[in-house]
Amino acid sequence: QAIILRPYICQGGETCLGWQVAFNRLSKPIQQTIAALVCDGHRGLISVSKKRRWILQRCHFHLFASLQRRCSMRYFGQHRQESKLFDSLIREIVTTPSTKEILSSVSNLKEIAKNISSYRLRSVLRGFVRNYKDYRHYLTYPHLKLPTTTNSAESLISSISYFCNRARGFRTINSLTKWVTAFLKNKKSVTCNGYFSTKLV
């Protein structure tokens, strides 16, 4: 059963320490039920998952969005075949059930990354090659029924941001926390990857 935990809101941006504090605030019974973490690859979340030995499933949407941001139209136009090739290899790596069948694709992608002229794109590809297993844990642990994206959470956050903007801000973090809690209770559920519903507890 999936659940939405009551919100924890702190000042400042997203940080490693902030995520550590957020997870430390969870009760031990809840922490003990967590087996995996689906995230966008933020260092703080990766650190938390490693420290707590949780399975880490990285978001496919953020991966391809990152590639698009770093693969400019000019670069794509000049290296069309190469761009299509690494895109195809990545999709094969993150969707093929058999690990043995993708080893050659991982090796090919590693070689392609060495010759990429764009530093930013090369960095993303090398990062993917190092951590490709994190994008496949939904296949490795099918019994957990892990989503491959964080889209449901991103959508919920967007809804909260939209109504916060309409409210024109809050005087204190406490009042904001109360408002977000009420918003989540009113929403009642959120669809996760099209299969599971969650309830606020």
PLM features: what roles do these ranges have?
Residues 27, 49, 139-141:
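Short hydrophobic/aromatic segments of transmembrane alpha-helices and their interfaces
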Residues 79-117, 129-130, 160, 175-190:
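Charged alpha-helix within mobile-element recombinases
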Residues 12-15, 19, 94-102, 169-173:
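Intrinsic-disorder/low-complexity, polar/charged segments
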Residues 98-164:
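Amphipathic alpha-helical
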Residues 1-39, 43-47, 55, 131-134, ...:
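RNase H-like nuclease fold core
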Residues 54-59, 137-200:
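Amphipathic alpha-helical/coiled-coil segments positioned at domain termini
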Residues 36-84:
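Conserved beta-strand -> loop -> alpha-helix junction used to position metal-binding or nucleic-acid-contacting
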